[in-house]
Design a protein with these regions (language model features):
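Glycine-rich, small-residue loops and helix-cap segments
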Residues: 1, 84, 111-211
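Solvent-exposed loop/turn segments at secondary-structure junctions
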Residues: 35-37, 65, 147-149
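Structural recognition of the beta-strand scaffold that forms the well-ordered cores
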Residues: 31, 59, 142-143
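Flexible, glycine/charged-enriched surface loops at secondary-structure junctions
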Residues: 6-12, 54-63, 92-96, 206-210
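Short connector loops at secondary-structure junctions
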Residues: 55-72, 106
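Acyltransferase
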Residues: 17, 38-61, 82-93, 117, ...
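A short helix-breaking turn/cap at a secondary-structure junction
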Residues: 1-44, 202-211
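Short helix-loop capping/hinge segments that flank enzyme active sites or metal/cofactor-binding pockets
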Residues: 23-32, 72-125, 163, 170-179
Length: 211
């Protein structure tokens, strides 16, 4: 999470330079119009606030690929990372053993055919290529939380999740809601500049639960 690891060829040694006071008005921010047409007032309010801040918002279309069919790639990668845990049967010691708990995800992943894994990764590369093309024209995009979670897990694009208000549940509890800002690969500085500006002007992060 901090610095490069010369034993991991997938990690690059790159500088991180972020000026929290840099100008945000030069940023080009995308949003998927159809995602904000849903009945989530706080998400729509986020777009309104960004426009009030004078930011340049443009409508975009995310790559049209069945990313949900590639979710098992992440399960296989997680299973490989925790292979020793499964082989040693120490996964039995984990408390949650429900169908979709991690121990059973690790176990099921061992049954996925290698051919299917390779084919899915070929499609994943196409998605990554299309996302790179999209992000070359914008600095970041805004999305309702979880809408782009699987997509960015597959492509590696950085994401900042921010509070964007509160809503009342059916049980009359008031719970916080959130919005996601997704940036370019190695574009965390611009991503954090936009996120900090939004957070500072809204102040939702300053609201704490009452004891």
């Amino acid at each position: 999470m901090h610095g490069s690891d010369n034993r991991d060829g997938t990690v690059k040694d790159l500088p991180f330079n972020w000026d929290p006071d840099s100008d945000i008005h030069s940023l080009k921010i995308g949003y998927v119009e159809s995602s904000f047409a849903k009945a989530h007032p706080n998400d729509q309010a986020t777009l309104k606030k960004l426009r009030e801040m004078g930011l340049n918002l443009v409508s975009i279309q995310l790559p049209d690929y069945p990313v949900e069919t590639m979710e098992f790639i992440l399960s296989v990668e997680a299973a490989a990372a925790f292979d020793e845990l499964t082989r040693s049967n120490q996964d039995d010691l984990l408390t949650r053993q429900t169908k979709d708990a991690w121990p059973n995800i690790f176990r099921r992943a061992r049954m996925i055919p290698a051919v299917e894994y390779v084919q899915a990764n070929r499609l994943r590369w196409q998605v990554m290529d299309k996302m790179a093309e999209l992000m070359s024209d914008i600095d970041l995009y805004v999305a309702p939380s979880f809408d782009s979670l699987l997509l960015t897990n597959l492509t590696g694009h950085p994401c900042v999740v921010l509070p964007n208000g509160f809503e009342q549940t059916n049980s009359s509890d008031v719970v916080p809601t959130s919005i996601s800002f997704i940036g370019q690969l190695y574009g965390k500085a611009k991503l954090m500049t936009a996120a900090k500006a939004y957070q500072d002007i809204t102040g939702f992060h300053l609201n704490y639960p009452q004891p």
